[in-house]
Every structure is written in structure tokens, then in C-alpha cells.
């Protein structure tokens, strides 16, 4: 099958968050399964050119219709760890992608409306006719709209679109200007509730809503998050639209790259290990203590790795530190905060706890240290307020680090409570789950984990090994996406 991914990010060249990892990981898996996969991306001035091999001008005269005229673009081609990537560079006074950043400009709505138009125009002018066009997040939400309202009438009538929503919080809001720029034009037609009209502002257009309405299949990043988006405020106002299109909407878990996150081959940890020689994990625990100057003691290490913000349940992260100490455990934190108040709070906590031999707070991010923490910790807490998919718990499971998670989003689909999950036999359970976003619920789950570590170390080790048996690579998601591609290719 011939698949084109259109996205605003692809790791490691363009990475602002998890989107880039997903686009790369899925593309790689689809190619491993024998498909032809190409990616279309903006040519940002600030992307990591050192990760592109053989970058060259591939299409010199791409003229993209824009506001009744046309903008000249050059399309470059290069290989990113074996993936064929096309990078679109517009030559205009707007300098859409020469801003020194990926996002955060006042005209982001127009920047990515243009990118969506340019991607389709490139496919059209170069006579590329993929079976599937896979778009990601609001930045490419207009691709299916323009495909079916404009390009279908120019010979692109067999392409089918899968649209994946990674983050409902950012939906892409435009207006009449978007319609006139892209050639969609008909205001009265698109400003309708069953088309692109924003549900909060009737005078605005919602790019993500357009992607939902016009795509042949819509996915988000976990089955439980798909339900939350339809029936709770997690959908950020798009719940009704998603429910109307529920027959084509589903959730597929993201995967993690086991070439990078795998204790058996991890180059960042001093002692490699797997399920059979799990005792090597204890040596990594010793190495972690030595690096972070924690005291050598017969205590479990509980970790938190991730952003320090409200989405991640920062108030519970704070409580987990002190509850761990009260329960006779050690605590390691590796995280960063962009919000000034949260950053100041944790800097104060770091200073206050500086002389405590059982805690270490590392503010910032350190790739190498994150691997050692996963390998050396006994448990990892993920107390998120909402979590579309979550990768931390998947990595923890692979490293035999028992996750303690709040039962939201993709955490529900990946962590199964040792004591209370009645849907799985005991040998399939792999962690601890709590549901309320309060200290008492967190404490209850942490207590059960810590008590098992102290009272039945053999059972705790068995729980950790059970978690290592789960496969959260891209293998299963790749198959599920191919099933969706086949479905929309032959149904529509």
C-alpha cells in the first residue's frame, strides 16, 4: 500500500512533543510491514538538518494557489533514518516557516492552512496518487476538506484520508480569511455546524472539526481517550461532532521504540537485563543511588519522569514525594515546568530537601539520566489529570518498573491493577491504578505497592516481570492502522 503521512512534526528532525515520535514510529512500522511510506513536512529553518541524509531539491517549481494568486515553493527530498521525507519551502514575504520556531506565531492558522494546501498541490502536480493520506492534529485538519472539496475534481478522487488527533486542546481556529486564501471560498457553506463552524464561536472555523467531518476515518491515541473525548470535556467542545461520526472514530494506542527503550540493549544504563536476569536491575538501582547521592538502604525507589504541569497532576506529584518518604521509600524526580509558579515551587522544594538522603529532584531534562531512572527505580508514578495515551507507563513496564497510575485515558488501556482488576487473571496484571484526583486515592495505591515491596518482595518482583512481558511496541498499532487503511480503501 502507498501511504503518505502529512504532519507538522517528525522526530528527530522536527520534534516539539510526542507528535513527532508517533509520526516517525508509525511510518517506520508501516514500512517494516512492506508498505511504501512517504512523509510531507514543512521545511522549518530551525529543524535538525543533521538528521537528514541526502537532502536535495526534488521539485523546483511548485506553485501553490493562494488568495487568487500563487506562491512559488521548492520541495526538498531527504532521508530521515531511512524514511523518505519531502520538505516544502515557500518563497514569500510571509516567511511561513522561517520563524525560528515550529509553533507559537500569531498567524499559525494561516501558516498551516498554507502547508495543507501546499502538500495537496505537491501530490497533485507531481502525479503522486497514494492509497492513503494520513494527517495529524489541527495543523493538517484542512487537508481532507480541500481534498474532497477541491482536489477531488482534479483527478485525486481515489485517495482516502485517516486523521489522527493527538491533542484536543489545540484545534486550529481560523476565519473567512482561511476560506479565501485556500480557494474554499463559500462562506455560507462552511460556516455550518455540520461543516467547519466552531462550536464556541459561530464566526470562526475549526480546522480539527473539519478534519473530523471530512476524513474517512478518525483516530485518537487510545481507546479510552476516544470514549472520554465523546462523553466528557476531554474533547474540548468536539464531543458532539465526534459522537455524530462515531462509526468512523476509534482509539489506537501509540507505541514506543524498543530499539531505544529496551533494558536488554540500552546503551545508557550500566547493566543490561531482561526478564530472565532481572537481578541485574538491582545493580542499576545501586548505580542510580550513587549518581544521585542517595543513601544505600533497603528501601524502594519511587520515580516521576515528565513535565510538571496541571495535565500531569502536579499537585499529586508533590504529594507523592512526601508520602514516599513517610512510607519509608526513596523518591527521584526528573521533570521541568514551563509555568513560572510551578517552576518556583519545585525549586523551593529542591532546596528544602537538598540534605535529605532519600530524595533527589532533578529539574530539567536529561535523556541519559531518564534511562537510568527507569532501570533503577522500583516504581513510577503517573498521576495525570488527563493522559491521551501516555508513554511513561509503557517504558516503565518494559524496564520492570511497576507503574502507579491514575485511571484516565491510555493509562486505563495499559496498566491493570494487581489487586482489583477483575477482567484479567492475576498473571496478566501489571501495576496499580487509582481513580480520584486526590491525595487519599494516590496514597491508597502507593501504600499497596510499597507494602508489597516490603512484605512480599518475591511477589513484587513477579509483578514487575509480568509487566515486562507486555508488548507496547509499534507492532500492534501498525497492524491496527493497516486494518483501518484497508477498511477505508475498500469501503468508501
Curated annotation (Swiss-Prot):
Pfam families from the UniProt entry: Glyco_transf_5, Glycos_transf_1
EC number(s) stated in the UniProt entry for this protein: 2.4.1.21
Pathway the protein acts in: Glycan biosynthesis; glycogen biosynthesis
Molecular function via GO: alpha-1,4-glucan glucosyltransferase (ADP-glucose donor) activity; alpha-1,4-glucan glucosyltransferase (UDP-glucose donor) activity
GO BP annotations, alphabetical order: glycogen biosynthetic process
Catalysed reaction, written as an equation: [(1->4)-alpha-D-glucosyl](n) + ADP-alpha-D-glucose = [(1->4)-alpha-D-glucosyl](n+1) + ADP + H(+)
Binding site for ADP-alpha-D-glucose: 15
Keyword line: Glycogen biosynthesis, Glycosyltransferase, Transferase
EC supergroup of this enzyme: transferase
NCBIfam families cross-referenced by the UniProt entry: glgA, PRK00654.2-1, PRK00654.2-4
Family membership: Belongs to the glycosyltransferase 1 family. Bacterial/plant glycogen synthase subfamily.
Record function comment: Synthesizes alpha-1,4-glucan chains using ADP-glucose.
This protein's name: Glycogen synthase 1
Organism: Trichormus variabilis (strain ATCC 29413 / PCC 7937)
Gene of this entry: glgA1
